Structure formats: structure tokens, C-alpha cells
Amino acid sequence: MIRNLTKLTKFTIGNRFYQSSSKGRFSGKNGNNAFKSIVGVSVGVSALFAGCVFLDQEKEPESTPSIDVKEKKSQPPKTKEDYQKKMDEEYDIEQFKYVIIGGGTAAYHAIDKILENDKEATILLISKEYEVPYQRPPLTKSLWATKDDNVVNTLNFSDWSGKKQNLLYEQESAYGNEILQFIRTKKVIDLHIDEKLVLLNDGKLIRYDKCLIATGGEPRQLKFTSTNDKKISTYRTVEDFRKLYEVVKDGGKHVTVLGGGFLGSELTCAINSNFQDKNIKIDQIFPESGVLSTLFPDYLSKYATEEIIKSGVNVHTGTLIKDVVDNSENGRLTVTLNNGKTFETDHVVVAAGIIPNTNVVKSTTLEIDPINGGYVVNPELQARTDLYVAGDVASYYDFSLGVRRRVEHHDHARATGEMAGSNMSTKDTPAPYTYQPFFWSDLTPGVGFEAVGNTSSKLKTFSVWEKPSSDETKQSYTKGNIYYLNDNNNVVGVLCYGNYGKMDTARDLILKRRTIEDLNQLQHAIDFDEHH
């Protein structure tokens, strides 16, 4: 057990990632956070489990049993505390005040809040990945623009202002001390909520006082005749970035990207814009009529697709991949489309979205949202007493929109992580999650936006462009605002296309829930002035 924890000094968290403008959306790591307070804290009296702070496990055991908390036969304990103490001793159970399952953005920001609020905290972070927590947006954006082949090792990049950043929120020196410990490359395969026990895939049991599930999602897989995982991959982690970068860095390759959503489109455009001079060719394939079709109105989806084609990408709309097979003659892959066409490629990236990872609880039933997926939580982000959920895997009720949602964007992961961490560690009444997260994307120089709320293309939309034209064929899509309305004519979502820094105004418009009697009321709801 860990004893005599070093006290942390009080700090004030900055407004990381609360900026509404894309020009501030990656301000980097705030130098004034709780992690800085624990860097340099010496490793404690007893190291984690097998005598080391960082534990690696690449292979799962052959059997992964569910949790069995039956007590060995002996003198029965008199109290629950006696029972737990006896059980912990007999089964060699390590105990932490806070256990965080998942090593992403939500987990990082939850830990930051816990360290701020609880000076007596002992925290265990469990991640299936090797890396300590890192930012995901640069994986499809800034990392590709570094022009430095050593980026796969340094993970350094420049933000919008030219400031140097690192993909990792904090370096490894912030982890592995008396206060915060980290288990890498291991999975939680079960939770026993009543006993507050976590079971790892090596059979190790860990007891918690409070636990956060922030497991994110798993990439959707597609089955092909070829099973060559060196040439067919999904794209979700920093390791995926490293592998794909190695494919394209020397040039002269052909890459095929499956998917026309955020991931597929951002990855396609990032590689294309930064490696065209190295003769990298890209085909993007998806079944919809245009990119981001679940977000953009049809006309804008088609326009964005045309812009991507103009940038040099070979885009296949309304198309599915029928199969991918190995070509034994030249070592490449042969792609067959559902329209009968075939072509050869060097690498296939499956970017078909994610499935929320709800596989960490087996012996206890947690409610899963049957429509959106993810664990159902209350307004305070609790799934059960002392068990919280944040990030992509949380299904929560959005009071502003009046619907239950599950959101897969960075700002939401940050905000729910902070809220869950705060509620887990506060001495005050836990607060409800009412924040309206925003998201952004930049595909080509002519396709970039920020958005907030429910921006489903299935909703009614009303578009206001800075330079409107009566001739649709001559319309300039440089700067505009798109409003999404529900059946009651309430604005429930706003997308600001090329019009940055307007998210606070957009949030206010959504929160008012005002019925729009005349759509022309929205003509001047959000201005086109520059706010960077």
C-alpha cells in the first residue's frame, strides 16, 4: 500500500480548450496545472504491484475470468471494513482512492481536477495503450504538417500560431509517483461495483473508492479476403499514426482511405496536402453522396467534396469496397469496388467510425443506451454510486437540446473529464453537466468550420452567407452560418463555416430555445466580424 503521500500545493487551472475560436482551440498544455505539482515526487514506499511503477503487458492471458469475491473460509469478519481488509490481504488487492479506466483526454482532465481538489488523492490510471495520455486531434491534423520524419519519435508539432507543442499532455515524469501511478498496455475486463473491485486481464484485482470509466471507443473493422494488418489498418491511436507515417514518408505510395466522415476526410486531406510533393496518391471511398454528409446540408457536402477533388484526391462517392486481396506478384493490394472497378494500392485505412467501448463491466449490469450506445449516466455523470463515465462512452441527457446524446468530440471529452473528476473529488454538492461542447475541422484551405449543438443534416437548416448570390452556381462559400432547427423551430445547432470565434454566441442562441417564427430573424443572429 502507498503511505505518507506528499501534499500537493494549491493551483489554479487555466481555461484550456474552452476557447470558442479555432485560433485558440489548441493552446497546448497549460503550464499551471496539477500535474506540474507532482513531477519530481519520489516513488513511494511500495511501488505498484510487481515492484515497478510502469507495468507492461503485451499479451492477454489465455483465460480471463470474471470477478469472484467469495471469501476464503476463516473466522467471519465483524464489519464490512474488516471484511474488505481481510479480503485485500488474502487476495493481495491493491487499493486506490481513485481508479481511472482509459488513458485519453477525458481521463487526463479528470485526473487534473482530482489533483486540484483532493490533496490526499491516490490515483491509478489504467490504459490499454503504451503512451501516457495524449491529444487525439493532431493525429489527423498538425502532426502531418511537421515536415520532420522524426515526428514519430518526438511527437512535436506546431499549433496554429506557430507555437511548438507535444502530443503528450504531460511527459512520463508526471506519472509513476506516490500520488499518481500508471499501468500501461493492460485492459480492465470486469468491474464488481458493489465491492468496488476492478479486474485486469492478468487476473489482478484493484479496489477503488471512486472509479471513472473513460474507455472511449474501438474502431469499426471491415472484413476482407486479405488479412494483412501491415497493409490494412484502422486509425485511432498514436501507434496507428506512426505506422501510417512510415508508409508515406518516403513518397511514391498509393493510400486508400475508406470513410467520408470526420476521420476519413481529415486524414485524407492531411496526407494529401503535406505529401503531394512526394508523389503520394490517395483514393477516398465512401457510400454517401459527399463528405461529412451527416453534418453538412447536401449542397455544402457536394461543394466540400469538389474542393477535396480539386486538391488532388481521387474521390469515389456513392461507392463501397467489395473486397481487398493480396497481389502476390507485386506485393500490393488489389481493391475491388461494388461498381466492378478495381485498382491497386499500397495501404488501406479503414476510417468507418468507432463503437463505444462498453466491455469493461460483465459481472454487474450497467444500463447501455439502446439508441446512441454508451453507458447511461445521470446529470452528474454517474452510472452508479461512486462510478462515473466520461468522454465518448458516456450517454448523457442534454438539457439544452432536450435529448439524450453521446458525443465523440475532443471538447466534450475534455469537459466531461473535468466535470467527472470534479464531482468525484469535490466536498461540495456534485454539479450537473450542462456545457455545450463544440467541434471543428479544417479539410482544405476552402473547407473549415466550427460547430456546436445538434448539427445533424437530417434537421431543417437555414444558411446565411456573407456574400449571398441569387445564382446558386455563383455562390461563394467563403464565410457563412448554418442554423439547424428542430420541429418546433428552435435553433438546436449552429455551424460557422469559415467564420471563427463565434461559438459563445452560437451557444447563447441554442440556450435561449427561442421559437423562430420567421427564418429571416436569423439573418443577423451571428455576425461576420473577425474574432480571433
Swiss-Prot record:
FAD binds at residues 102-106, 128-129, 136, 141, 188, 236, 392, 409-410, 440. Residues 1-26 form a transit peptide. Residues 98-440 are annotated as: FAD-dependent oxidoreductase. GO terms for biological process: chromosome condensation; DNA catabolic process; mitochondrial fission; mitochondrial proton-transporting ATP synthase complex assembly; mitochondrial respiratory chain complex assembly; programmed cell death; protein import into mitochondrial intermembrane space; reactive oxygen species metabolic process. It catalyses: A + NADH + H(+) = AH2 + NAD(+). The keyword Hydrolase does not apply. A motif (Nuclear localization signal) lies at residues 400-406. Probable NADH oxidoreductase that acts as a caspase-independent mitochondrial effector of apoptotic cell death. It comes from the Eukaryota. NAD(+) 1 binds at residues 260-263, 288, 353, 408-409, 440. It holds the Pfam family Pyr_redox_2. NAD(+) 2 binds at residues 160, 450. Its EC number is 1.6.99.-. Keywords: Apoptosis, Cytoplasm, FAD, Flavoprotein, Mitochondrion, NAD, Nucleus, Oxidoreductase, Transit peptide. This is Apoptosis-inducing factor 1, mitochondrial. Belongs to the FAD-dependent oxidoreductase family. It is found in: Mitochondrion; Cytoplasm; Nucleus. It is an enzyme of class 1 (oxidoreductase). Its cofactor is FAD. GO terms for cellular component: cytoplasm; mitochondrial intermembrane space; mitochondrion; nucleus; pathogen-containing vacuole; phagocytic vesicle. The lineage of its organism: Eukaryota, Amoebozoa, Evosea, Eumycetozoa, Dictyostelia. Its main location: mitochondrion. InterPro entries: AIF_C (IPR029324), FAD-oxidoreductase/Apoptosis (IPR050446), FAD/NAD-bd_sf (IPR036188), FAD/NAD-binding_dom (IPR023753), FAD/NAD-linked_Rdtase_dimer_sf (IPR016156). Residues 63-84 are annotated as: Disordered. GO terms for molecular function: DNA binding; FAD binding; NAD(P)H oxidase H2O2-forming activity; NADH dehydrogenase activity; oxidoreductase activity, acting on NAD(P)H; protein dimerization activity.
